[in-house]
UniProtKB/Swiss-Prot annotation:
Belongs to the polyphosphate kinase 1 (PPK1) family. It catalyses: [phosphate](n) + ATP = [phosphate](n+1) + ADP. HAMAP family: Polyphosphate_kinase (MF_00347). SUPFAM superfamilies: Phospholipase D/nuclease, PHP14-like, PPK N-terminal domain-like. This is Polyphosphate kinase. Mg(2+) binds at R392, R422. Keywords: ATP-binding, Kinase, Magnesium, Metal-binding, Nucleotide-binding, Phosphoprotein, Transferase. The lineage of its organism: Bacteria, Pseudomonadati, Pseudomonadota, Alphaproteobacteria, Hyphomicrobiales. The gene is ppk. Its cofactor is Mg(2+). The keyword Transferase applies.
Length: 726
């Protein structure tokens, strides 16, 4: 049964028996892969949102294409492996791997077609404002002069024209690699041959052309330019047919749990990943069928793995065009605020944190405060020890530099570097070696568990005692992504939280199971039970006639046990509001099953990434008595059962109000970049009701200071209460 058929059978229950049947059926869940495709459809819809500047629409198109590539490299590759091994075990929603794969490929084909359709519209619109992508047949004589020089100086030296015959076998095409396939005829005797030109990844994709006196920004793609100079590469041959193709390979890593040297094991696995099986081939629609079939045979690709594209391949690379100097076609530049609370204390992070907990809301507030915290720790002679987790960071990481500086200054520095951070494995191996050379004690955590928690800890001698300052985050220690991801950075000197963080580090470095922590919770041992207990408490409050409410904000909601607990809560009368950016396997709004559950997704200028979990505790939401957590964990089995994740309570009244009444409420009432998730897993854009004011959460956060970071100078500019009880 395919997903469409499965969805068609999910009817609104007519009575108690039907509700019970659905509650016990696999169809109470939405397939996670299909839900992800719905999410990427929302991203593509933003490329069609005329409220965004044109180049921002192009950016969303690029993001949706890049997302789809990664989805194939990991999720589709995994399903293909299961099908190949004959796995018939259904997913929680009841679909076998082969059923999921068939549905995914059909949906992906439509998505790719729609991406290309949107590109054609954007191409026309961009040309109208002076950004023109020129086809090879449209180049002028003046263009050819420029291109000839560029080709000879910058492209020709790195190309290798390759005839395909027994002496010249079909070459290896790397993941996401471009190639130009050719059918050639020797002019001397009419003899035909197939040939290939691998298009180098390190050469710029879009070549600037003269403006021809129009002032326009004119470009041609690298593959189109190479096509103009085939005679330079194959003199004496005529082109009978040609076309560009691109491959996507299996890029998931398989790591043995028994390993003597984890770094060497990963280095070997990374080399093997480069040669992963081809799981998708994109071919230019202009490529003759005979030539396309030849390439497919050489790559070992089946018909259902070939996607014929009537447009431009690798739309993800249009992110390069977004960088052109046309600020009028982009979002207005935004400069993140630095928390005034830190400035009030002369830039002394420790003094500001010691006075009161601080929550920094990225990207609206600068990630520089996290860097400054670590730099101050590195340079403060009273700091004796620093501990840090690193999951992802930037190529020129100030975090790594601060840790190295601290170690070189003689401090005890421990860094947990997670080698299993997907697509950042090589960078993390490099960082680990750099840190070790500086004297940092580097550990790699668990082979079987991925350490995803975001923790930093500085131990400082103050008088006769040691004080511990900690940072608990929802996002990575990555200064670049911190400019576009919405995340939370919590700073505290609370000794209870500090002791919990120390025990979590001991768990990671020494396998010392932390047991029940005093305030925080950690997966895979205590985080999920903590959340389930809170859901159970809300159910009891509802049954007792007290206010009962749950607010969740995360990237994905997949875990069956959590979903079933939320269904039970809905049936008991608990009001559940979920802000889920991506995958949501829960079916909201079904009478008797989930009628009290609402799910929305926000897709906008910034990538929603923070995780927040709120429980009314018998007082409803929002309430100063509510239980509020921030977390590194999404509600997925991998996060809750197979990763080291953290759940941190927020008890400081100001920070509590900031998270609950400011951040969560703003996300809940957003009606400009929000989508309502429907029972079948699809979504519809939320628009203001008649008489309702438009409200954009991202714009609100850009223009309003946070409660805990605003400082004395902004004390009188507290944001108005946003909450309207529904």
């Amino acid at each position: 049964m395919n997903e469409a058929a499965a969805l068609a059978e999910v009817e609104i229950p007519a009575g108690a028996a039907e509700v019970l049947a659905l509650a016990q059926s696999p169809q109470r869940f939405i397939n996670r892969e299909i839900s992800w495709l719905h999410f990427n459809r929302r991203v593509l819809e933003e490329a069609e949102n005329r409220n965004h500047p044109l180049l921002e629409q192009l950016r969303f198109l690029s993001i949706s294409a890049n997302n789809l590539d990664e989805f194939f490299m990991v999720r589709v590759a995994g399903l293909k492996e299961q099908v190949r091994e004959g796995v018939q075990t259904p997913s929680p929603d009841g679909l076998t791997p082969s059923e999921q794969l068939a549905t995914i490929l059909a949906s992906a084909a439509q998505l790719i077609s729609d991406q290309q359709g949107r590109w054609l519209e954007l191409r026309h619109d961009l040309a109208g404002v002076g950004i023109v992508l020129v086809d090879g047949v449209e180049v002028t004589a003046e263009d050819l002069v420029v291109l000839d020089r560029h080709f000879l100086n910058h492209v020709f030296p790195v190309l290798t024209p390759l005839a395909i015959d027994p002496a010249h076998p079909f070459p290896f095409i790397p993941n996401l690699g471009f190639s130009l396939a050719l059918q050639l005829v020797r002019q001397a005797d009419g003899r035909g041959m197939n040939a290939l030109i691998r298009i180098p990844a390190k050469v710029e994709r879009f070549i600037r052309l003269p403006d021809l006196g129009t002032g326009a920004l004119r470009f041609i793609t690298l593959e189109q330019m190479i096509g103009l100079f085939i005679s330079r590469l194959f003199p004496g041959y005529a082109v009978k047919g040609q076309g560009v193709f691109r491959v996507v390979r299996d890029s998931d890593l398989e790591i043995e749990e028994e390993a003597e040297d984890l770094v060497r094991l990963f280095e070997t696995a990374l080399k093997q990943r480069r040669y992963g099986e081809v799981i998708r081939m994109e071919a230019d629609a202009a490529m003759p069928a005979e030539l396309r079939n030849f390439v497919a045979r050489e790559l070992g690709v089946n018909d259902d793995e070939i996607f014929v594209v009537g447009g431009v391949l690798a739309l993800n690379e249009f992110s390069q065009l977004v960088s052109v100097d046309r600020p009028d076609l982009k979002f207005q530049a935004y400069n993140a605020r630095f928390p005034e609370r830190i400035r009030d204390h002369g830039g002394d992070c420790f003094l500001a944190i010691r006075e009161k907990d601080i929550l920094v809301h990225h990207p609206y507030e600068s990630f520089d405060v996290v860097v400054q915290f670590l730099r101050q720790a590195a340079r403060d002679p009273n700091v004796v020890a620093i501990k840090q987790t690193l999951y992802r960071t930037s190529s020129d990481s100030p975090i790594v530099k601060a840790l190295a500086e601290a170690a070189e200054a003689g401090k005890s520095v421990t860094a947990l570097v997670e080698l299993k951070a997907r697509f950042d494995e090589e960078a993390n191996i490099r960082w680990a070696r750099d840190l070790e050379r500086a004297g940092v004690q580097v550990v790699f955590g668990f082979i079987e568990l991925k350490t995803h928690g975001k923790l930093s800890m500085a131990v400082r001698r103050e008088g006769a005692q040691l004080a511990t300052y900690v940072h608990v985050g929802t996002g990575n220690y990555h200064p670049i992504t911190a400019r576009i991801y919405t995340d939370l950075s919590f700073f505290t000197a609370d000794p209870v939280i500090a002791q919990d963080v120390a025990r979590i580090f001991n768990f990671i470095t020494g396998y010392a199971t932390p047991g029940e922590l005093d305030a925080m919770a950690v997966s895979p041992t205590g985080l999920k039970p903590r959340l389930l207990n809170h859901i159970a408490d809300e159910i009891e409050f509802a049954k007792a006639g007290r206010p009962a409410a749950i607010w969740l904000k995360c990237n994905s909601l997949v875990d069956p046990e959590i979903i079933d607990a939320l269904y039970e809560a809905s049936a008991a009368g608990v009001q559940v509001d979920c802000i889920i950016r991506g995958i949501c396997c829960l079916r909201p709004g079904i009478p008797g099953l989930s009628e009290n559950i609402r799910v929305k997704s926000i897709v906008g200028r910034f990538l929603e990434h923070s995780r927040v979990y709120c429980f009314g505790a018998g007082h409803g939401l929002p309430s100063p008595n509510a239980v509020v957590y921030i977390s590194s964990a999404d509600l997925m089995p991998r996060n809750l059962d197979r990763r080291v994740e953290t759940l941190c309570p927020i008890t400081n009244p100001t920070v509590h109000e900031q998270v609950l009444d400011q951040i969560m409420v703003a996300n809940l009432i957003d009606n400009q970049q929000s989508w309502r998730v429907l029972p079948d897993g699809s979504s519809e854009r939320i628009v203001p009701a008649p008489g309702e004011e438009p409200f954009n959460a991202h714009q609100y956060f850009m223009t309003n200071p946070s409660l805990s970071g605003r400082g004395k100078s902004l004390k009188d500019s507290s944001p108005r209460s946003l909450f309207v009880r529904r």
